[in-house]
């Protein structure tokens, strides 16, 4: 049974690539045509690649592997957090801190500090401290939570990295490749597919497109862990809100204007 329908891919705008002036020739085989100066991705190939990624990711999780979801663009932060939590995996949805993978032992120390700060507050230690010091501790805790909250239970390196926006997250991808961590990624028409082990050619800017693909990846993790993944009909792209953009007269349809 297919994990996504062609209709869902179209409704979510996964087929809208970047401007024909901003493209990577290595993505040529995934491009169907161009329209109004925008490359249109072949959703048949997107569907095929989704199936490949789904099966491999399910296998990794079934064998006890963990997956790190990564997407730091403001409009997709919620989707990354919600779907990773739904499938019980890890996530980074704000700035990628250099060394999260390649310098993990140092990151673990920061994570431990985060746990210590939470425990101090829960145990009432902060109540005995001056207000000024408590404010500083809360500020430190909140900052750590913002950047490391999604991986605070990650005790070892993940076996797979799922990325939204390969170009923006290139530092994280480089770290994963250096450690032979498998990289799964939405790859838009301006990106280099050779950097990825499992490519999903798709629009990585539109909220609905990212939500759909991230939802599918989460389903793969759920199925791999022995759970019951949601069926395609349970996803409704129309319920995913569009980003609020400033009014522009004579603009193109939404999916074509969110591109860089």
Swiss-Prot record:
Gene3D superfamilies cross-referenced by the UniProt entry: Glucose-6-phosphate isomerase like protein, domain 1, Helix hairpin bin
Annotated signal sequence range: none
Single Gene Ontology MF annotation: structural constituent of ribosome
Keyword Ribosomal protein listed: yes
SUPFAM superfamilies for this protein: Ribosomal protein S2
Record keyword Isomerase present: no
Protein name: Small ribosomal subunit protein uS2
Disordered: annotated span: 240-260
Keywords linked to the UniProt accession: Ribonucleoprotein, Ribosomal protein
